């Protein structure tokens, strides 16, 4: 994805307030061998971009007005506590030859055809919806697919069951980390609670 940016010459709290009143968002680009770069963004453009999952989990192209394009990764977003307003954005430069660590969303497929749902009427509980991975920029997936097609009622899928794309590893490997569980409605515990006291 691509977004537009302009160099920000004036800094400080009051300058940032003026920018926001003018429909702009202060931001910074850091990392790599170059000095940090203070930029400003169009609020509406960045607001709508942030609503797309792809903007959070892919290498972005920053088109700097009057300068060269740069490859960056979204690192953090500061939102207004109660308004739909972006206050500040942090980006990190991307080096094609240097591994990066970032979070990638999980996409769950085939839940409706799994034995857990079809045969047991289970409720699928998504315990984890994103994972942190390590890879070179060119190997960064926009998402990682988790196939629930063989999930049984009362069963679960762990981190070790996830098939990662080539060149991608978990930043914090934990084979027993539960990703998804299939919770069967009712069950012995509920039956015991509903039974009248002797």
From Swiss-Prot:
Q: How does it assemble?
A: Part of the 50S ribosomal subunit; part of the 5S rRNA/L5/L18/L25 subcomplex. Contacts the 5S rRNA. Binds to the 5S rRNA independently of L5 and L18.
Per the record, the gene is rplY
Q: InterPro entries recorded for this chain?
A: Rbsml_bL25/Gln-tRNA_synth_N, Ribosomal_bL25/Gln-tRNA_synth, Ribosomal_bL25_b-dom, Ribosomal_bL25_C, Ribosomal_bL25_long, Ribosomal_bL25_short, Ribosomal_L25_dom, Ribosomal_uL5_bac-type
As one GO molecular function, the record gives:
structural constituent of ribosome
Q: Which family does this protein fall into?
A: Belongs to the bacterial ribosomal protein bL25 family. CTC subfamily.
Q: Which UniProt keywords apply?
A: Ribonucleoprotein, Ribosomal protein, RNA-binding, rRNA-binding
Which residues, by range, are in coiled-coil regions? none
Record Gene3D superfamilies: Ribosomal protein L25, beta domain, Ribosomal Protein L25, Chain P
Check the record and name the Pfam families matching this protein: Ribosomal_L25p, Ribosomal_TL5_C
The task this protein performs is described as: This is one of the proteins that binds to the 5S RNA in the ribosome where it forms part of the central protuberance.
Gene Ontology annotations of biological process type: translation
This protein is called Large ribosomal subunit protein bL25
